[in-house]
Structures are given as structure tokens and as C-alpha cells.
């Protein structure tokens, strides 16, 4: 009788662990989010220092999966993205650049402009009171032969850019 009871308790515990696992689509989303940050960092390896700093700022974005609804080969994940408020900071940067250099930066001021940009974004990275925005996104995913694919990536990228997505047309 004790053996049967132990077996039932053990079986129940295993079922609870399996049932409490994350859905495959959520795991795929988490992988894609990490890939986005690593691809962004790789893309910036040969770029100027200002662009590298911007990539570091974007990489500070985090997410929380609030809800997952799987319906066959389609899934909707309700996700909250917490990202640096780039919309605000880029507007401040553009205003500072325009004030200091005008609308067009002359060739002889290019090096000074690059240093200004690097300093601005470095200071932003080091700011302990940096402002974040939280954006709720409904991420649509579809299962294909290659696995789960995000079908509305622009919404996710826009949220990850912290309000700066509209500045680049997203």
C-alpha cells in the first residue's frame, strides 16, 4: 500500500512539473527576444562609438509575459516591454545637436559631433535615474516548419525602442 501511495504521489508531482512548464511559443518568444539583442550588438561591432552606445541602451529592454493563448498553430502573447524612454532622449539629443551645430553638421565639425554623440549616450547609459517606459504588446506568433515565428515584429521592435519607433517609421 505504501509503494502504491508513493508511486501516486511521485506521479502527481511529475505531472505538476510538466503541467507548469512554459508553452513552446513562450519559449520561442524568449529566444527571439534574446536573439534580437545579440544580433543588434553584432550589427554594431563595426559601427561608430555612438551607434554602439545606442545599441547598449536598446539592449537594456526587458520583458514580462503576462498571458499566453495558444490556439493550434497560432499564439497570442500579451507581453509588457520595459525599455529606456528613447523617444524622449532622442528628442533631447536632436535639440542639443541642433542648438550646438545647427541643422547640418559641417565636415570640419564632424569629429567634434561624434565625440558629443558618444558623450551624450555614455552619460545616458551611466545615469542612475534613466527613465523607462512600459508598453504592453500583443505578440502574434505562428507555428511553421522552422518553429514559432513572430508575425507582427514591428510592434515588438517599436516597444523595445522605448517610444523611438515612430521616429524611424514603425
Question: Each predicted region: which residue ranges?
Answer:
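Beta-strand elements of well-folded, non-transmembrane domains
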Residues: 81-87, 143-145
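Post-signal-peptide N-terminal segment of Sec-exported extracytoplasmic proteins
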Residues: 39-78
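Short beta-strand edge/turn micro-motifs at domain boundaries
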Residues: 102-103, 132-169
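C-terminal motif of bacterial Sec signal peptides marking the signal peptidase cleavage site
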Residues: 16-19
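Mixed-charge, low-complexity intrinsically disordered segments
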Residues: 85-132
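Bacterial signal peptide processing site
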Residues: 21-24
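Bacterial N-terminal signal peptides that target proteins for export
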Residues: 1-8
Amino acid at each position: 500500500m505504501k509503494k502504491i501511495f508513493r508511486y501516486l504521489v511521485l506521479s502527481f508531482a511529475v505531472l505538476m512539473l510538466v503541467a507548469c512548464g512554459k508553452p513552446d511559443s513562450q519559449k520561442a518568444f524568449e529566444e527571439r527576444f534574446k536573439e534580437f539583442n545579440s544580433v543588434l550588438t553584432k550589427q554594431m561591432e563595426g559601427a561608430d562609438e555612438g551607434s554602439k552606445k545606442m545599441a547598449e541602451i536598446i539592449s537594456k529592454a526587458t520583458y514580462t509575459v503576462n498571458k499566453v493563448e495558444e490556439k493550434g498553430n497560432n499564439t497570442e502573447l500579451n507581453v509588457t516591454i520595459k525599455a529606456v524612454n528613447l523617444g524622449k532622449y532622442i528628442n533631447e539629443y536632436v535639440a542639443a545637436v541642433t542648438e550646438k551645430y545647427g541643422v547640418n553638421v559641417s565636415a570640419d565639425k564632424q569629429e567634434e559631433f561624434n565625440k558629443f554623440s558618444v558623450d551624450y549616450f555614455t552619460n545616458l547609459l551611466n545615469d542612475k535615474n534613466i527613465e523607462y517606459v512600459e508598453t504592453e504588446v500583443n505578440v502574434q506568433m505562428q507555428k511553421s516548419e522552422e518553429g514559432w515565428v513572430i508575425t507582427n515584429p514591428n510592434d515588438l521592435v517599436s516597444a523595445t525602442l522605448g517610444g523611438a519607433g515612430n521616429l524611424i517609421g514603425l
